[in-house]
């Protein structure tokens, strides 16, 4: 169909289908050529009149200037747009503007090498398809520096947009290692990642909010302080791993938020306790490490598994090992204690889960088995954050770990990074951290 704003004569031999194909409102396709480097699309605007930006007087035509920019790939080959710009001359003698050329930012910005469609296509490829800058440069028929220099300003503007932090009610935090080089060359190896865990119509998935150099409570505290009172007052739940530094930052900056200890990190140390007891009892009874044929050594893997997943034969093997020697009673008790910690998160209702958790917090620290008592003291130290799980509908830091997985994949795809600023922008993009900003919605 014809452009609704086009006033060009139908007798000029325009092809409406070609105009529809290039999909540039207000432009006509006037020629197509195929080069070794790809397709070249010649276009011109429909505007036959233009007013001077200085005085508003209708300008006079003053020739053409051809500008070539990189377009998004067409049919799998690189494409270029050759825009035959009209040059205009102001006829008003008192006007300071003598000549000027037409501009249209839907095609390209002034003096840019990549067109708007190419930039939009590249950003979407990075965001959703796991692309790399080098791969995009090959598909566009240009260089790495050209692609990144045009994309980076949009990503930086989106990262600086305060609109990204609107509506955050649930916050998660975790760290990851972004390089394995000398710290003196690239700075801290660890980055603290802050994640929006809010779910709802406007928050379909978790998204990365920021990456901050370092791993400490001070880093997290300073980031929260920089966000402002309005942001901090909106946080209702703050999920975290059992790291006291992050807990101190939450207590200092998010006084009204409920701290929730991640369930995985509650369950994770529990299966290790029976293993420690098994090795100690093994040494006490046999005087050596576990060997093939030793009753306790044969169940070393079963001690770490959930009892609800064991077959009848595996349950029988456990009973045989527990009753093989009177000293094995410590291993059996440790095993059942660890299983109860697992069961906390598998109760029918949150009330039942909290009741079992409270009972374990009271009994485990006084257990005569040292390894279980140590586990109990650790859980008791995090009592409030542990029990808060049952008051917040099972709030978890798990989505934060999922974001870390996306970051790891992005870093492997790019074959490592050297520039921390570029790394932060790329990771924010692929983890939906910039989706809320209009700067990435070209």
Roles of regions detected by a PLM:
Residues 1-97:
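Short, conserved DNA-binding cores of transcription-related domains
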Residues 9-12, 104-112, 203-218:
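Glycine-rich phosphate-binding "P-loop"
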Residues 27, 257-258:
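A structural micro-motif
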Residues 45, 54, 60, 188, ...:
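Acidic/histidine-rich catalytic cores and adjacent linkers
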Residues 56-60, 66-171, 175-181, 232-233, ...:
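Short, positively charged, Gly/Tyr-enriched micro-motifs
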Residues 136, 172, 239, 259-262:
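A structural signal for short, well-ordered beta-strand segments and their strand-loop junctions
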Residues 146-239, 244-249:
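RNase H-like nuclease fold core
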Residues 186-190, 271-283:
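Short, surface-exposed amphipathic charged segments that create phosphate/polyanion-binding patches used
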């Amino acid at each position: 169909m014809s452009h609704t704003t086009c006033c060009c004569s139908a007798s000029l031999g325009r092809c409406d289908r070609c105009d529809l194909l290039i999909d540039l409102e207000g432009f006509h396709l006037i020629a197509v050529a195929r080069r070794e480097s790809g397709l070249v699309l010649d276009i011109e605007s429909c505007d036959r009149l233009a007013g001077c930006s200085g005085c508003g007087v209708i300008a006079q035509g003053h020739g053409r200037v051809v500008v070539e920019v990189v377009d998004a790939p067409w049919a799998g080959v690189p494409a270029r747009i050759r825009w035959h710009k009209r040059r205009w001359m102001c006829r008003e003698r008192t006007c300071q503007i003598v000549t000027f050329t037409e501009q249209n930012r839907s095609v390209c910005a002034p003096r840019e090498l990549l067109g708007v469609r190419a930039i939009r296509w590249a950003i979407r490829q990075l965001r959703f398809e796991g692309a790399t800058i080098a791969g995009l440069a090959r598909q566009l028929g240009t260089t790495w520096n050209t692609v990144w220099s045009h994309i980076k300003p949009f990503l930086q503007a989106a990262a600086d947009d305060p609109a990204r932090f609107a509506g955050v009610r649930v916050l998660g935090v975790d760290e990851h290692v972004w390089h394995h080089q000398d710290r003196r060359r690239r700075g801290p190896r660890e980055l603290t990642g802050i994640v929006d865990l809010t779910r709802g119509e406007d928050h379909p998935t978790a998204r990365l909010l920021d990456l901050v150099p370092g791993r400490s409570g001070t880093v997290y505290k300073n980031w929260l302080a920089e966000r402002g009172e309005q942001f901090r007052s909106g946080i209702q739940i703050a999920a975290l791993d059992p790291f006291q530094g992050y807990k101190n930052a939450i207590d200092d900056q998010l006084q009204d938020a409920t701290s929730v200890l991640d369930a995985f990190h509650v369950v994770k140390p529990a299966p290790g306790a029976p293993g420690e007891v098994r090795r100690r009892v093994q040494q006490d009874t046999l005087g050596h490490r576990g060997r093939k044929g030793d009753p306790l050594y044969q169940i070393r893997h079963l001690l770490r598994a959930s009892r609800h997943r064991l077959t009848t034969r595996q349950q029988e093997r456990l009973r045989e090992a527990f009753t093989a020697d009177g000293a094995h009673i410590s291993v059996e008790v440790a095993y059942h204690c660890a299983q109860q910690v697992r069961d906390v998160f598998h109760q029918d209702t949150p009330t039942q889960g909290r009741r079992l958790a409270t009972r374990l917090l009271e009994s485990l620290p006084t257990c005569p088995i040292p390894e279980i008592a140590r586990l109990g003291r650790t859980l008791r130290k995090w009592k409030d954050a542990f029990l808060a799980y049952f008051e917040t509908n099972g709030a978890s830091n798990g989505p934060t770990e999922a974001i870390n997985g996306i970051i790891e994949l992005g870093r492997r795809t790019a074959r490592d990074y050297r520039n921390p600023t570029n790394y932060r922008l790329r990771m924010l993009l692929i983890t939906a951290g910039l989706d809320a900003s209009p700067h990435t919605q070209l």
